[in-house]
Amino acid sequence: MNATDTTVTELATTPAGTLAADRPPGTGVHAGPVTIRHRDFSPSIHPDAYVAPTAVLSGQVSVGAGSCIMHGAVLAAQGGPVQVGAGCVIMENAVLRGTVPHPLRIGDRVLAGPHTQLTGCTIADETFLAAGAMVGYGAHLGRAASAGLGAVVHIGAVVAPQGRIPAGWVAVGDPAHAYPPSQAEAIRTALAGTGWSFLPFILGIDDAGGRRDQLRTALARYTTAMASHHRQDQLLPPADAVDDDHVW
């Protein structure tokens, strides 16, 4: 390290904006994220939030004060809004989707780890979701709950405040009961007892038919709906270049 290098400690203790004048033109400056106008709705990002330039926000998406949306994250309002509260961290490659009739609502001070998938669910304040966790339609995690690495909170499951779903386990029911992955038969039985089934619930497909026919019907409906739903999407102009010293 030479005398002109800046250490991480110095960055962390330097008031925002004071380093920019010492940098070559263009250093530490980025364009805004990819934002898409969808069905007359455009994303809303609080001025104090940070959204990485490679993140994608589509439609009725709101990001609260002090929240950070990291690289590769996708926040898509596909008929229902996506709301991210204040002080949240949505990490790399997370996918957050709001649908009809299930919006996605995330409270304050929530951490969603890399590759998490959250669809049409409610995540209360101060919840922790480890990398690869999945939360399905209509599910609810109470305040200060947690889902471990690769855990699944199934469609319609309700996890109590401070409830913990261990890594790799599957939560089913209201109130939720967590099963280890080794109990596949118990998981299937529990799911059958909830009345929640993906194809009938999401796509209106009769569960009684053969699997092959079900998938053919499902994909025909899904591709048609998605194409129609997004045909009028409009890529918004990039935001003005912003200095990212504030991240430190």
Give the predicted meaning of each segment.
Residues 3-40, 78, 92-93, 99-106, ...:
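Glycine-rich hexapeptide-repeat left-handed beta-helix
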Residues 51, 62, 69, 84-90:
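Well-ordered beta-strand segments characteristic of repetitive beta-sheet solenoids
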Residues 51-52, 153:
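Short, structured beta-strand/loop micro-motifs enriched in basic residues and often containing a Trp
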Residues 52, 84-85, 106, 118:
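Hydrophobic residues on conserved beta-strands that form the core of alpha/beta folds
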Residues 55, 73, 82, 90-96, ...:
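N-terminal leader/targeting segments and the first structural element of proteins
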